Amino acid sequence: MSKTHLTEQKFSDFALHPKVVEVLEKKGFHNCTPIQALALPLTLAGRDVAGQAQTGTGKTMAFLTSTFHYLLSHPAIADRKVNQPRALIMAPTRELAVQIHADAEPLAEATGLKLGLAYGGDGYDKQLKVLESGVDILIGTTGRLIDYAKQNHINLGAIQVVVLDEADRMYDLGFIKDIRWLFRRMPPANQRLNMLFSATLSYRVRELAFEQMNNAEYIEVEPEQKTGHRIKEELFYPSNEEKMRLLQTLIEEEWPDRAIIFANTKHRCEEIWGHLAADGHRVGLLTGDVAQKKRLRILDEFTRGDLDILVATDVAARGLHIPAVTHVFNYDLPDDCEDYVHRIGRTGRAGASGHSISLACEEYALNLPAIETYIGHSIPVSKYNPDALMTDLPKPLRLTRPRTGNGPRRTGAPRNRRRSG
């Protein structure tokens, strides 16, 4: 992490459990991010927290550190049974649950606390086998958690810590009834430590905190600035006919190390993937109907650098921690203003700089005024020369082979295509 992203507050300044501090130091975490510096004094004192921070500011480590410290510092509930986890971390998507689990593994190995993972799509029996042996911290999505609870594979009567991550996304995906169902099966709010984290603390999220938490403290980091100041924003106005060629020209011109391209529909994402894969780019496709194993493989390949470009719907816009994304392209302007913030928040993370390029086409340009009102500023407009757009483009591929794309590793320099000033 960049030093500009950190505070003077050190993890060692807090009365954290020694094993937790040891893991943090081994992982290179010495100074707190702003959200961690605000949250830890409260959670270590047993206070509930509802936190808002821009994506990529350390929310996950804030609640994991608090959770492990609390469980190590407090005994389990008397007569706790093997199917009763001590902590529950709820996430809106399978990918986010998997990432939280991965981030928690070093802490679990050092402390002896057992982790469990529960998400839909696949792995039912494998996940259940782990749960049957007993877990201390259960991380999962609401649907699979309810499934296990209804079959008595898990019982939430001994929960001591609850974390709700990306709470606003839970509402967007219609999971709020599931969340309330799970909360009703836990001990009362004043008998557990409750943490809620979200990129936005809307009225409905605050209402949930009031319902399910014990007089939570609200903490916010840079709430007045909805888009990161390290993200360069840029806007083009292409015609529908020139839109794809403009995207491909910009990719050749920018030559991003790691880019995510967002579109509003599955069909549009597949179309973009086909054009880029045909042009030799190492590109992956992430939409809602991609099988879970393939989704995780694509994300892993993108994170490792085996893929340079990921084309995605908003299923990937929130919660995913993909480091070192240099560029975000909004091929379609989103219909939801908040999705614009979450999309471009994939870049410029953890103190790094990033570049967001949006295409306001004839179909989605009407979304722009609401987006600019929401973010509080106009997006700088750039012009392009239609005569300079790429024309020597191969016929797009269709999805008749693996979606991760088999384009060759990019070598050499990009083609010399320049846009007008």
UniProtKB/Swiss-Prot annotation:
Instruction: Write the record's keywords in alphabetical order, separated by commas.
Output: ATP-binding, Cytoplasm, Helicase, Hydrolase, Nucleotide-binding, RNA-binding
Q: Name one GO biological process term.
A: RNA catabolic process
Which major enzyme category is it? hydrolase
What PROSITE patterns does the database record attribute to this sequence? DEAD_ATP_HELICASE, HELICASE_ATP_BIND_1, HELICASE_CTER, Q_MOTIF
The UniProt record lists the Helicase ATP-binding domain at 40-219
Task: Return the EC number.
Answer: 3.6.4.13
Mostly located where?
Answer: cytoplasm
Q: Which GO terms describe its molecular function?
A: ATP binding; ATP hydrolysis activity; RNA binding; RNA helicase activity
Name the domain of life.
Answer: Bacteria
Comp. bias (Low complexity): 402-414
Q: Does the keyword Manganese apply?
A: no
Identify one Gene Ontology CC term for this UniProt entry: cytosol
For region Disordered, the annotated ranges are: 392-421
Q: Which Pfam families match?
A: DEAD, Helicase_C
Q: Which reaction does it catalyse?
A: ATP + H2O = ADP + phosphate + H(+)
Query: Member of which family?
Result: Belongs to the DEAD box helicase family. RhlB subfamily.
Q: How does it assemble?
A: Component of the RNA degradosome, which is a multiprotein complex involved in RNA processing and mRNA degradation.
Report the protein name in the record. ATP-dependent RNA helicase RhlB
What organism is the protein native to?
A: Shigella boydii serotype 18 (strain CDC 3083-94 / BS512)
UniProt lists the gene as rhlB
